[in-house]
A protein has these predicted regions:
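Targeting/processing segments of secretory and organellar proteins
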Residues: 11-12
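Short, Lys/Arg-enriched N-terminal segments with co-localized hydrophobic residues
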Residues: 20-39
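Active-site beta->alpha loop and helix N-cap motifs at the rims of alpha/beta catalytic domains
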Residues: 41-49, 54-55, 60-186
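C-terminal alpha-helical cap/extension of soluble enzyme domains
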Residues: 48-52, 76, 243-246, 253-340
Length: 340
């Protein structure tokens, strides 16, 4: 039985595959998928929060708030923390700040293996420096965008870019999660390119974060690249992705609803949990919908300011700006309605 659920994004349709235990054929098919998925241990899997980065009024990283948030996310059930991605405003920070942010987060949690920092920059030398640092401090892996300034780049050009990074870093400990977010980067990562990269660097290219919001693309990734850890960038898509053999998520709304995502992770393959899964899925969709009421990054920080009772969370890195006071009040009022 397929239940169709419209997400807040008008162009995204989430298909939740629910179990109909009255049909033996469907039950056996689902059980086979569950067993295959549970046996498949990806190097990187689970719930990873695309962490927002708190800053002071002058744009300095607020390491106290960051440390508190990272510790809280791990306690709430996140398997890992993806620092300095799109949600973390990574490309608004210089190299020194990005190194400081990663080191502070690792030191406060004493869990370097939980971290998947974004290390991409427009300059390949800077990306190599950040990636080498991440490897040296014990990060589980790094999340790498394709080169995103020049548009219309060929697969050959993108391959040379990634190859240059990997060869330039020259460390067998390196593990790379490719980052497919074509609506922002304008540079899609094609299946043929993934094939070529995995063939050239089978022990290094271990995953892909797909933030396209397209379930069909996730399905095709799982079918074509079963050894690749396929991670969705959309919280509500984690459940159907797991049912297709995916590895988990790296998402923005996990800053706010990590516990609900963990309920889905822990229960999706169990019998008689449909009600529990639906309740958590509904909450995730509502939190994500609210986070996108205005600018998503500013709204998430506004929600975190309320949750932690810390106005320091409201500050944004230029060129992004905080929500207007009236918008903040509306968001906080709706938060109270969702979590009375």
């Amino acid at each position: 039985m397929k239940q169709r659920l419209r997400q807040c994004d008008a162009d995204v349709e989430i298909i939740l595959i629910c179990t109909n235990f009255n049909r033996l054929k469907d039950y056996n098919l689902l059980q086979k998928t569950i067993e295959e998925t549970l046996q498949m241990k990806h190097i990187i899997q689970g719930i990873h929060s695309a962490v927002a980065t708190p800053v002071t009024k002058d744009g300095t990283p607020d390491l106290r708030l960051l440390s508190e948030h990272c510790r809280s996310l791990l306690k709430e059930g996140c398997h890992g923390i993806a620092l300095l991605g799109s949600t973390g405003e990574a490309n608004s920070f210089g190299l020194k700040d990005r190194i400081t942010i990663l080191e502070a987060a690792i030191n406060c949690t004493n869990a370097p293996e939980a971290f998947l920092p974004g290390t991409s920059t427009p300059a390949i030398a800077d990306t190599i420096e950040l990636t080498r640092h991440a490897v040296s401090v014990g990060a589980k892996g790094v999340v790498l965008l394709p080169p995103y300034y020049y548009k219309g780049v060929s697969d050959e050009g993108i391959f040379r870019y990634y190859s240059g990074l990997i060869e330039g870093i020259g460390d067998d400990r390196l593990r790379v999660v490719l980052y497919h977010i074509p609506q922002i980067s304008q540079i899609p990562i094609s299946f043929d390119l993934i094939d070529r990269l995995m063939k050239a660097y089978p022990d290094i290219i271990v995953g892909i974060k797909d933030s396209s919001g397209k379930l069909e693309n996730l399905r095709n990734l799982c079918k074509r690249h079963p050894k690749l850890a396929v991670l969705t960038g959309s919280d509500p898509l984690m459940l159907p992705l797991l049912q297709m053999g995916g590895a988990g998520c790296i998402t923005a709304t996990s800053n706010l609803c990590a516990e609900e995502l963990r309920v889905i992770w822990d229960n999706w393959g169990r019998v008689n949990t449909a009600g529990k899964l639906k309740a958590s899925q509904d909450k995730i969709v509502k939190w994500r919908t609210l986070s996108k009421k205005y600018d998503q990054l500013a709204t998430i920080k506004t929600m975190l300011a309320k949750r932690y009772r810390e106005d320091g969370w409201l500050h944004m890195m230029s060129p992004l700006v905080e929500l207007q006071p009236l918008q903040q009040q509306i968001v906080w009022s709706e938060m109270k309605r969702l979590d009375p």
